[in-house]
Amino acid sequence: MAGSSTGGGGVGETKVIYHLDEEETPYLVKIPVPAERITLGDFKSVLQRPAGAKYFFKSMDQDFGVVKEEISDDNARLPCFNGRVVSWLVSSDNPQPEMAPPVHEPRAELAPPAPPLPPLPPERTSGIGDSRPPSFHPNVSSSHENLEPETETESVVSLRRERPRRRDSSEHGAGGHRTGGPSRLERHLAGYESSSTLMTSELESTSLGDSDEEDTMSRFSSSTEQSSASRLLKRHRRRRKQRPPRLERTSSFSSVTDSTMSLNIITVTLNMEKYNFLGISIVGQSNERGDGGIYIGSIMKGGAVAADGRIEPGDMLLQVNDMNFENMSNDDAVRVLRDIVHKPGPIVLTVAKCWDPSPQAYFTLPRNEPIQPIDPAAWVSHSAALTGTFPAYPGSSSMSTITSGSSLPDGCEGRGLSVHTDMASVTKAMAAPESGLEVRDRMWLKITIPNAFLGSDVVDWLYHHVEGFPERREARKYASGLLKAGLIRHTVNKITFSEQCYYVFGDLSGGCESYLVNLSLNDNDGSSGASDQDTLAPLPGATPWPLLPTFSYQYPAPHPYSPQPPPYHELSSYTYGGGSASSQHSEGSRSSGSTRSDGGAGRTGRPEERAPESKSGSGSESEPSSRGGSLRRGGEASGTSDGGPPPSRGSTGGAPNLRAHPGLHPYGPPPGMALPYNPMMVVMMPPPPPPVPPAVQPPGAPPVRDLGSVPPELTASRQSFHMAMGNPSEFFVDVM
């Protein structure tokens, strides 16, 4: 086999590059004839080949596209294709078998004995090697009967072994066919042949070239009247016959390679009378070698394709009705598909199934991640490695990935997520980008809260990702503990957990134990009957509340060696001497707010902290008591209900913390004076301006201003704010 290419040299000169037989090195000659007037006789006069040589030239056919045309008339002009003339020369130096008539004559004689082949498993089939999509002629009865169950490497080796025999005994000058039965290559490639087409080794040898130009374009002989299945077959065999480096290069031209796409062809007939639309989006693939086919991008619910169920995202669209997409550009294919859909009647879609028809079964996409049409295999492998829910028992490597670069102590890392894991590690895992918790900007009262999440989402995440919760209510208590520990924060410092409120992550840079110093899981978590009691942590520099008595005390100064300043709820626990309060049973009528008859706590109203620990007695001072190292928040009610005199100083439940912070001395109200109860007022009880120096104000507190100097309209605004905070769930509306 030989090939030649001519290009304009000088004026009136044509360069001829030809390949002789199977030689890899081309030859170059110059013919002093313009390219538009060069004839076969001019070509022969320069080459001076024997008379038995056959010449094939590349030309364009209206029905088949690029073909190889045999020219035997010396006066015939050589076809010009894209400004060049391409030719293949088959020499008659080798012994040639008896000449056979053209292909279309023996087709009728040889077709009946060829029985249809049994179907082969799709997973053993070969892949698509060219950048153009595969297609099959409508006359081919079953397209996946034409596939050969052998690997690509085996095919290359076997074809290379048979090349000398084919050159010695099976090739002839005209590219015709043997009359003594199929050659060994025919038997070797019989799986590709159907009863309506006949491909012999001799013709195959004329279309199998090792040149780079053949690597770029497919060439076929116009005398064979091949179907599109045979053209796909020829392209496929030519790819497998190439040398291994070229196989590797060819596989990189298209993202749809043998490992990602198999020739499992299905034909789906859709009855468009029952449905209003087809219901698919298509994606075109292109590369440096041209358009690479049309693929199913997504399937819409309610359409004809979704109702059928066999076509899935990632499938390659080969043919619609009788319109084949083999030699169409992507734009033409889209236009043809649009025209067919607008016409009445059923629609027949022929698609090549994806290597894995359901890649979405391997992973779950996050709710906000866009879906883009990509290679299905790369989609599966990449997403399976990077996407998915957080495992229930992550290994050490997974946990180290989540906490990588964090400032947590060594004791906080490498543990499984369970109820025994420290809360800081659980919160770090929950704050990871792929944890599954939906964290995004939220809108509340026309205010944007960045990186916020819903309380119910936190409870659900804890219940599904942290081991050890027998029921969801326990996960809710755990979430309340996260709020009290400062690992998650409410936007307005609300310390009672609610599933309808928005929260943000707190400071996760401290050590694990630093968050748990003041935490007690027995506190009111919002899941009991007091869940509707929305109490607020003290705001920095709270202004005085009107008409309340003032007492001589001061805020405790932060310890100079403390790793972090005490949180505001810890500061508020010293408001009345660490938790002393008068009995509310006898003095409840003096409350300006809602009256509590159960001896509630002064700040948070936790029922667990209402147990009487102070000793009642006139003028007696109770002994300090400790409760697990947690500070008493607000005032503790005395255990008496007979209206006896209140204790002069309540029990300070924060004795351990007082030892940890020397210099923090509680100061109580004057003995014998009952305090009017109101949860909000008790929390907001201010220090009088004279005895409070600026150095001992809470960190970050603004200048203290007496509310008496504030205009009445501003006072009403502050009261409205507290009323709104008393019913926060009515204002938290997610409008995103």
Curated annotation (Swiss-Prot):
This protein's name: Segment polarity protein dishevelled homolog DVL-2
Role, per record: Plays a role in the signal transduction pathways mediated by multiple Wnt genes. Participates both in canonical and non-canonical Wnt signaling by binding to the cytoplasmic C-terminus of frizzled family members and transducing the Wnt signal to down-stream effectors. Promotes internalization and degradation of frizzled proteins upon Wnt signaling.
Species this chain originates from: Homo sapiens
Residues with the Phosphoserine modification: 211
Ranges of residues in domain PDZ: 267-339
Encoding gene, per UniProt annotation: DVL2
Start and end residues of each stretch annotated as Required for interaction with FOXK2: 250-355
Outcome, altering residue 298 to A: No effect on interaction with FOXK2
Mutation effect (residue 275 to F): No effect on interaction with FOXK2
